Amino acid sequence: MLLAMEGKLFLCQYLIWVMLLLGQLHGCTSCIEKEREALLELKKYLMSRSRESGLDYVLPTWTNDTKSDCCQWDGIKCNRTSGRVIELSVGDMYFKESSPLNLSLLHPFEEVRSLNLSTEGYNEFNGFFDDVEGYRSLSGLRNLKIMDLSTNYFNYSTFPFLNAATSLTTLILTYNEMDGPFPIKGLKDLTNLELLDLRANKLNGSMQELIHLKKLKALDLSSNKFSSSMELQELQNLINLEVLGLAQNHVDGPIPIEVFCKLKNLRDLDLKGNHFVGQIPLCLGSLKKLRVLDLSSNQLSGDLPSSFSSLESLEYLSLSDNNFDGSFSLNPLTNLTNLKLFKLSSRSHTIQVKMESTWQPNFQLSVVVLRFCSLEKIPSFLLYQKKLRLVDLSSNNLSGNIPTWLLTNNPELEVLQLQNNSFTIFPIPTMVHNLQIFDFSANNIGKFPDKMDHALPNLVRLNGSNNGFQGYFPTSIGEMKNISFLDLSYNNFSGKLPRSFVTGCVSIMFLKLSHNKFSGRFLPRETNFPSLDVLRMDNNLFTGNIGGGLSNSTMLRILDMSNNGLSGAIPRWLFEFPYLDYVLISNNFLEGTIPPSLLGMPFLSFLDLSGNQFSGALPSHVDSELGIYMFLHNNNFTGPIPDTLLKSVQILDLRNNKLSGSIPQFDDTQSINILLLKGNNLTGSIPRELCDLSNVRLLDLSDNKLNGVIPSCLSNLSFGRLQEDAMALNIPPSFLQTSLEMELYKSTFLVDKIEVDRSTYQETEIKFAAKQRYDSYSGRSEFSEGILRLMYGMDLSNNELSGVIPTELGDLLKLRTLNLSHNSLLGSIPSSFSKLIDVESLDLSHNMLQGSIPQLLSSLTSLAVFDVSSNNLSGIIPQGRQFNTFEEESYLGNPLLCGPPTSRSCETNKSPEEADNGQEEEDDKAAIDMMVFYFSTASIYVTALIGVLVLMCFDCPWRRAWLRIVDAFIASAKHVLP
């Protein structure tokens, strides 16, 4: 009995110990109350600075419920034994304004090891403070090893606080406001630091104080402002350094071998995106531990060093986007058995990759990129590769059959890019493959392969654009249930879209079929594209009304149906799409009015209804939150332009309508960048309020009936005088390029992904009169790229403007085209126009200008078109520079102009100054002659009068005869008068 009792007691004790052990293993220990209260105090502090005051928005799991275990809260990790907080992360914050963090709130967390204050919110942390302990505030956190302060507004004032956290081994300060000389002296006491990440700041200068960080193993200084190899010299003293990132700086000159070649422990070296020149240093082959070497996007030349054959640990080698030319041998890579990724391309397009036909390297690549390498045949070594995930042979001279054997040999192949070659045949693979991304655009294949859905059923992205495909749309695509991106634009497909396609591809998100010959109704009602995000069907032959085929595509953001034969009105279901921000239906036969609900869509940012038959009044306002680009030209709109229309509008094109009334005094002119009102029936004067267009680039008021004078305040228009960052536009979401990403390689700092651009940005094309013709100026809509970014112009031609040309217009320094022709302008050509140093076209023809052409205009070196014909100008035509290129037509209708290129000669051997002096002398002589004439005439009259008076004083026959005549005249006058 006693033994039984002892057995039960032992069993109970055993079970208790097991339960305690399981409780500890499963983290049942709650956080201690002191730290729970401290976390709530921290939340209270963050809430006081947050835009969102509700408990559900700021750290919602951090609650005051006593039953809530703070170890289970978001961003918190506790020690399972002690219940003390060891990891603390506050997540994304949305502050009212940038705010400092009170470090005293962290003091209760004595065992915290990792502190994450990184955020992706707005107005993040901008510093620290502690009113009690000051800079020593972090010294009490003796276990703190990792501190992440990335994506905030921290600057150098933070460093004295950080310098007290001497236990730190990892410090991350990426994407902050570190600006100026390298600040490492402020961290000299962090002698235990092993990883320091200062990526994406604005650092420069010497790194001399780095010598204090003797244990440093990983250093990332990418995306800063280092520019000289001299600034990198101190790096050679970091003998324990294993990972070094210097990508995306501005370092020029040869790669400094005295720095990098001494770092024998280097495993990762990232130098991409600099300005290094010359050959790849031979001594890099002595870095035996090197696993990652990225030299892409520099200006390197020469060949691959033979010493690279010693880099037996090398896994990642990227040499793309350099200036290699001539022969480039891959033989040094033969025995690199660990090589997994190799990239090579050249900007010169003259590189000739050399390898023996029997070359069989010992590596098995997962990624190979050989773009712009002048390849005429598929490299034979690819026959021996069996583990490829990505192959990019784009932009070469490859021809013949598409190498589908790559699929057979590499069952794990996910991405195959063969665009911009000369392939002519696409043999469909005989086996089913898991390929996901396939780009064979810009080849010469001609016939779309049959049964692609059988061989490649899992395709996610397919780009076969610009191949000359003919015939009907391939029905097999309708069986590809996973396809989300399809681009078959710029081909010769014809006929209707098959029902199997419009109902079967339910995963489609991006569909581009533009520039084909598809016909019939635009997407039948049974169309089922519920995930559709981007639809481009422009430049086809679709006819009829816009049906309801897209009515269930409520996720649609971009819709382009321009240049078809569509008719009828804009369907009302379109207004129910909550995310729609691009609508392009230009050059069709649509009619009716613009529904107000269309312009009431909150995210609408690009509307092109030009070249249709819309009529009626313009909408009174736009509700877009981001600033809309609105093209309504070449329609039949009538009535006045509403005063409120410019609010939130960045581009407004109303040319060639039937609008009347005066130019309104717009309520809001700050957002407008391009204002085009040409070819209407606008009357009245140019309002002075137009001078408030502080961000305007193009202004076209031509072909109207405007009168009055040109306001001198038009010189207030910016026309590029502001800095480019001040001219930045609000970029709506669709301008941001979204991508399909796939991670290819990951190291300490380097993450290599394939980013397949979905090209969702909109190319904006503006036609503007310059150089006496209408030219198209294209660019991305945010003016970040393209010729449109550089174009500034003003056209007031073909109106009834009068008065003189304001001299102040010469202050529009960035103006490239100015057209004031076909008006009734008087006075002279302002000499201030000589300040228009960028002007390319200056048209002042068909006015009533007088005087001479200012000689200073000959300094305009960019001037390509100059027209002053049909005026009343006189004097010598300027010569030299651009004026030597103008024809006589530029000066016709000015009979008093002389000199080349006209046939009228001026006085020889006289400079323009002498000619002016001669004219003044002639004017002086003419004045003297007139004075002599007047004096002589007066003298004759006075002499004759004196003679008559003298004769009257003597009794002579002449006097008596004269008196009889006078008496007879008096007698006859008496008979006539009553």
UniProtKB/Swiss-Prot annotation:
Residues 28-930 are extracellular. It is a single-pass type I membrane protein. InterPro entries: Leu-rich_rpt, Leu-rich_rpt_typical-subtyp, LRR_dom_sf, LRR_N_plant-typ, LRR_R13L4/SHOC2-like, RLP_Defense_Trigger. GO terms for cellular component: plasma membrane. It is found in: Cell membrane. Keywords: Cell membrane, Glycoprotein, Leucine-rich repeat, Membrane, Receptor, Repeat, Signal, Transmembrane, Transmembrane helix. Residues 902-922 are annotated as: Disordered. It holds the Pfam family LRRNT_2. Residues 952-978 are cytoplasmic. Gene3D superfamilies: Ribonuclease Inhibitor. It comes from the Eukaryota. This is Receptor like protein 21. Glycans are attached at residues 64, 79, 102, 116, 155, 204, 335, 397, 420, 463, 482, 492, 552, 636, 681, 716, 819, 872. It comes from Arabidopsis thaliana. The keyword Ribonucleoprotein does not apply. The chain crosses the membrane at residues 931-951. LRR repeats lie at residues 141-167, 169-189, 190-213, 214-237, 238-262, 264-287, 288-310, 312-335, 337-361, 362-385, 386-409, 410-432, 433-455, 457-480, 481-504, 506-529, 530-553, 554-577, 579-601, 602-625, 627-646, 647-671, 673-693, 694-716, 788-811, 812-835, 837-859, 860-885. Residues 1-27 form the signal peptide. Belongs to the RLP family.
